[in-house]
Amino acid sequence: MLIRLTDLQGGATPGIHYDLGLVVVHTLYGYRGAVVAVDIRCMAGDTWYQSNKTQPPREQPWYHVLVHESGGLSTYVAQSNLAEDTSGDPIEHPRIACYFADFKDGLYQLKERNSSGSCSI
């Protein structure tokens, strides 16, 4: 089940450690990015899952992350492979403004629910 931006605006969901808009770092590969959506478990198919270099447990939250300075890439990452980025620095990504209104105190601020436009993950 995909948890979209609007689903988490009302409060926390149990088991999900990283809020939408939080800048995170991949603990194995070191890249930074911003969380834009969350699945409560891995929803990718078996072919995709088996093709990864690692296969973290599927029964945990998985995050859709816009990758910093990647030319517009996004990734799908298991919670166990992420940590909060404490640098306080924003990320550079061409779709960041589609999801977020501002960056303040190390966290991207979600756009209002009534904002026009739709962002694809």
PLM regions: where:
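Mixed-charge, Lys/Arg-rich low-complexity intrinsically disordered regions
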Residues: 1-23, 29-32, 39-42, 111-121
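Structured beta-strand/turn binding interfaces of compact recognition modules in eukaryotic regulators
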Residues: 27, 36, 68
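Short, solvent-exposed secondary-structure boundary/capping segments
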Residues: 42-51
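Phosphate-recognition beta-domain surfaces
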Residues: 54
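Intrinsically disordered, low-complexity, charged/polar segments
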Residues: 58-121
